[in-house]
Amino acid sequence: MDNYTDVLYQYRLAPSASPEMEMELADPRQMVRGFHLPTNESQLEIPDYGNESLDYPNYQQMVGGPCRMEDNNISYWNLTCDSPLEYAMPLYGYCMPFLLIITIISNSLIVLVLSKKSMATPTNFVLMGMAICDMLTVIFPAPGLWYMYTFGNHYKPLHPVSMCLAYSIFNEIMPAMCHTISVWLTLALAVQRYIYVCHAPMARTWCTMPRVRRCTAYIALLAFLHQLPRFFDRTYMPLVIEWNGSPTEVCHLETSMWVHDYIGVDLYYTSYYLFRVLFVHLLPCIILVTLNILLFAAMRQAQERRKLLFRENRKKECKKLRETNCTTLMLIVVVSVFLLAEIPIAVVTAMHIVSSLIIEFLDYGLANICIMLTNFFLVFSYPINFGIYCGMSRQFRETFKEIFLGRLMAKKDSSTKYSIVNGARTCTNTNETVL
């Protein structure tokens, strides 16, 4: 099930075939000098993991037919087979560069504003970490996507071997690691806000800046350890072919021997993807949906209490409750936008696992397209957070204006300011201010 490619996730699988069908290769005589590719004729298959004599990456290349073939039944890596070109070219080649620029600008502004001393709060620290990870998720694969799809080099065999390794690291492993950190930070953000709103006394102990920093470091470490085997589970062997009339060294992909000898291909990939679908996709989404519902219910109760305080003319407490509700609402919106982009990925990933391990029912050609679209909309959601912060956080807007328009443009009445998560930093006290 080694199917991770492109920005975040990309399956190149289809209904499984018999071992005889798996080993069937296109006639090498069909290969023409210069390696002219047909238009997107990739064949998508699921290997028989019971037959461990068949090396998985070898098989993955062989099923591509002519676009993966080389003489003497040796295949090499070419990206034309990895993605449906009718979708990959417009999404990755033409739209993604614009999204990359917008994401870099918007998330850089978020980091710049949230890193100011006046914005230094525990949850702002988590929001800043999310912005950095989302930005890196897009930056790492950008050079490869531009080269392959924007500049139209997808039909060429990837070479030399060092380029194959770099492409795998920056287009598969690093984006997956950064996205995993972002998912877990989003979960930490929701848990932290739930503690603030529903268990305020605990926030004094658990939601301090040192604890949040340690938690962020642990999350980054766990995400790195989760992806660490992926740096070493494949071996790229040099293979010389004739390309455009000249010898060219390309990549022949094999599963590393330590996977075969100590774990087994079946167990290795099953464990990796089961962990990912459970702890990166399904469980975080389920917990986030639950916390969002609980936070919304708590916010409704606080709104009723605010009306009571207003009738009793207790304006100071009324203002504190209003600001807390505004902060909670903003974080609910941030998490909801994340869930809208993440849940489809979780669903398709779970369906892929079930179809591969239990009962085969998934149309992998359609799943390929769905994953590409969900990847695209996930990246599309990244710049939206900047608009949410500007629209729903007064102090974010004030700090932004102070940075770019000067202090004269910033309003002087700090008593009405509230931070993204922790209330006002001067006159108004909330449960979060004392942290």
From Swiss-Prot:
Tissue specificity annotation: In the female, expressed in the reproductive organs; strongly expressed in the spermathecae and the lower oviduct. No expression in the male reproductive organs. In the central nervous system of both sexes, it is expressed in the brain and ventral nerve cord (VNC); strongly expressed in the ventral regions of the suboesophageal ganglion, the cervical connective and in many nerve roots of the brain and VNC. Expressed in the s-LNvs and l-LNvs pdf neurons (at protein level).
Record's bilayer topology term: Multi-pass membrane protein
Superkingdom classification of source: Eukaryota
Organism, as annotated: Drosophila melanogaster
Protein name: Sex peptide receptor
Swiss-Prot/TrEMBL keywords: Cell membrane, G-protein coupled receptor, Membrane, Receptor, Transducer, Transmembrane, Transmembrane helix
Gene3D superfamilies to which the protein is assigned, alphabetical: Rhodopsin 7-helix transmembrane proteins
Residues passing through the membrane, by range: 94-114, 125-145, 169-189, 212-229, 277-297, 328-348, 369-389
GO molecular function: G protein-coupled peptide receptor activity
Positions in the Extracellular compartment: 1-93, 146-168, 230-276, 349-368
SUPFAM superfamilies the UniProt entry points to: Family A G protein-coupled receptor-like (SSF81321)
Gene expressing this chain: SPR
Family: Belongs to the G-protein coupled receptor 1 family.
Chief location of this protein within or outside the cell: membrane
Reported phenotype of the disruption mutant: Fully viable without obvious effects in the nervous system or reproductive organs. Sperm transfer and storage in the females is not affected and egg fertilization and development is normal. However, females lay fewer eggs, mate again at high frequency and do not reject a second male after mating. Male and female flies display reduced overall sleep duration associated with shorter sleep-bout lengths, although the number of sleep-bouts is not affected. Sleep recovery following sleep deprivation is also impaired.
Claim: Transmembrane helix is one of the keywords in the record: yes
InterPro entries named among the record's database cross-references: 7TM_GPCR_serpentine_rcpt_Srw, GPCR1-related_rcpt, GPCR_Rhodpsn, GPCR_Rhodpsn_7TM
Gene Ontology biological process: G protein-coupled receptor signaling pathway; negative regulation of female receptivity, post-mating; regulation of egg-laying behavior
Function: Receptor for two functionally unrelated ligands; SP (A70A) for controlling reproductive behaviors and MIP for controlling sleep behavior. MIP-SPR pathway functions as a sleep homeostat which perceives the need for sleep and stabilizes it by providing a slow-acting inhibitory input to the fly arousal system that involve the pigment dispersing factor (pdf) neurons. SP-SPR is one of the multiple SP pathways that induce female post-mating behavioral responses (PMR) such as the suppression of mating receptivity and initiation of egg laying.
Residues in the Cytoplasmic compartment per record: 115-124, 190-211, 298-327, 390-435
